[in-house]
Each structure stands twice: as structure tokens, then as C-alpha cells.
Amino acid sequence: MNGVSGSDGGIGPVRPASTAAGAGPLRIVRLANFVAPASGGLRTALRELGKGYRAAGHEPVLIVPGERESDRWTEQGRVITLPGPLLPGTGGYRVLTDRRRVARLLEELAPDRLEVSDRTTLRWTGKWARRARVPAVMVSHETADGVLRTWGVPEGAARRAADALNLRTAHTYARVVCTTEFAEREFVRIGARNVVRAPLGVDLVERHPALYDAGLRARHAREDQTLVVLCTRLSVEKRPGTALEALEALLRRGARAVLVVAGDGPLRPRLEQRARERGLPVTFLGHVSDRGALGALQASADVCLAPGPAETFGLAALEAMACGTPVVASASSALPEVIGAAGATAADRGEAFADAVQNLLRRPLAARREAARARAECFGWRTAVDAFLKAHDATASVPAPVTAPVPPFVPGGLG
């Protein structure tokens, strides 16, 4: 091939795309921008969907930007990395900018389906797919108007810009996949008729209440303190500062609380400075790459916060709930739809989040943890994979895996 190589010897033989919808195994080529080693939700979704496509008998291929080119076989299928420049001010995000190289790679791969997880810089691939007669879907991971508002764009201007962007997206792709009704609204608003719903999911075996670690909790909080956890990328659209404001409000009210932040991003230095200047008990862990360690932290918390107002699903919040930990989420996001009555929502202010935390912790410990886990069990990855394959007019060819029993949660000092 031209430019992409690896230990497996390049792209391999080109084969013609299938002509019948969902006929036999499909080569599903997936493209994603704005990924980084320390990014969380998108990388998790890409990995789990790829694993699910493989298990269903299909051939997933993922193309992402990176520091250098590589071509690897992984649990999620083939992963091809093309060199992409760093995006300034994003804390490590890279983008695919060489259109000719990406187009050439797509031609060599000869996909049966194309799945794009970037609605801006990769939108041109929808036109490529039309010319190549390859059915293509775009996955909406964040609302356009929501992101624009978090960047300070006035609401009216953000809505007009989002509508224009979404019209072009809907016209370019065969289908637009939205993970929640919340995400779907901005496309319904413009009259798009090619929108389908497909939720994301959570690994209910990897994330479970038995990950609770009394020793880990004791390292971060005393027995009489509330352990609040924030698992998110520290960037503007995620609004991590709301968590610090909520902690400060709780402390003013006399509550004993500490905050542990798992995540990295461009706002980290500013947040650390704010915590120091205000004397807030905040621990910044940075990016936690060990998924077991992150799960133990989520399971050992009293409550997890999800303050991002533009979230269209909220994987980190769902993972916390699978661990038996309730979530307080932004009422402006899709999270109310995901967490249901098992968590709480709040306006995008620290005081409101503090209110929600205190109200949530008034519920009996066992009841709130059982409710969180039960709600998460509605969102297994098998359901998500089936929905995404349906959006591709693809079929699953293997039975659902048997879920291993989850050990019960044993309370130990929370409350």
C-alpha cells in the first residue's frame, strides 16, 4: 500500500463491496478524529463497538490519527493509525488532515460500510462514500449547538450555526446515528429524516459494585467524609469547573467532602491553581489508563459528577452506575435520559450540583447503589452493538454471550 504498513504486511487484498444489504460478513471501516491516548468515552465506544462487530462475524477496521503510522490487529479488529498533527489547545487531540491519503486508504480497503465519528473535519468522507456507492453513517457524539454554547457562542448564533452544519451532515450521509433522544433533537429540528437511534453501553462484567475498595477509599477520604469523583476530560465543553464549585458549596454548608478528579486536558493547570488558591481538598489523578483502577475508584465513591452540558450519552457516568455509584448530572445534557430516577440532575451551577449531591445522599445507601446498578443493566454493549449493526443494515451472526454473575456489593463505610 502507499504509506500505511505494519507487521501484518499492509492492507492486504482488495475485495469488492457487498451489493446486498447485510449479505454476509461486512467490512465496516470506521473513521474518528479528536482522539488521544488520554481521551475516554470515544475511545471506549470505538473499542467496544469494534469488539462487538467482530463477535457478530463482521470485519471492523478503525482509522485514527496518531503521532506515527501503524497497522495493528487488536481485540476491536484492525486499527490503522495515520500521522496527524496535534490540535493546539486541546491537550493532545490529533486530527486526520491529509484527505488524499485517507481517500486512497479507503479505496484500498474497499469498505462495505463506512462509519464516521466526526461531524466536522471528516464530513467530506460522506461525499467520498456516495461516489463509491458505500452506505455511510455519521455518529453524533456531542450536540453541535451545545458545544458551541460551551465555547461562549450566544444561544441564537449557536443554534443557527448548528442547524447549518447539521443540514449538511444529514444531506451528506445515508444515516445519522444518535445515541439518545436528546442527541436526536437537533436533527429533528431541521427536518432530517435519516436519523436512527442507537444507544451506547457499558461492560457489566468489568464494571460492578464488587470493585469497591475500602483501602482505596481510605486513601482519599476519611470515614466521615463524602467522596465525590469526577471522571472526565478537563476541557471547556466538559465544564469540570462545576465540580470544584459544587465542592466549595458543600464545604460552605459544613459538609465534609473531598473531590478526586480522574482525567486530563487543557484546563488542568487552571483547575489545580483554583483548588490551591481556595484551599479545596481536591486530588488530581490525571488520566487513569488502568481500567481496573478507574473502576475501583468509581465503585468506592459516594457519588460521581457529570457536569458536561453537551453530553449526548455519558459513558463515564454509566460506568460509575454499573459500579453501584449514583450520578449527579447536568440537566442540560442527555444524562437525565440515561440515568433516570437512579441518579439526580442539576442546573449548570455549583450550588445546584451541591443541592443534588446532598439530596441524593439522603437516600438509603443500599437503595441508591442498587438503583444505580439496575439502571446501568439496561445498557449492555450487546444491545448497543445490535443497534449500530441495524443502522448499517447488517446482521449479527452469533448468539449473545452469557454474562458472568456479578458479585454482590458489601457496604463498607459509605454514607
What residue spans do the PLM features occupy?
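Short hydrophobic beta-strand element within catalytic cores of glycosyltransferases
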Residues: P326-A329
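Conserved donor-binding/catalytic core segment of Leloir-type glycosyltransferases
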Residues: L211, L216-R217, A221-E248
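Donor nucleotide-sugar binding/catalytic pocket of nucleotide-sugar-dependent glycosyltransferases
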Residues: V64, I80-P83, R159, D163-Y212, ...
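Aromatic "clamp/platform" in nucleotide-sugar-dependent glycosyltransferases that forms part
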Residues: P309
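A charged, aromatic-enriched C-terminal amphipathic alpha-helix characteristic of glycosyltransferases
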Residues: A56, A366-D393
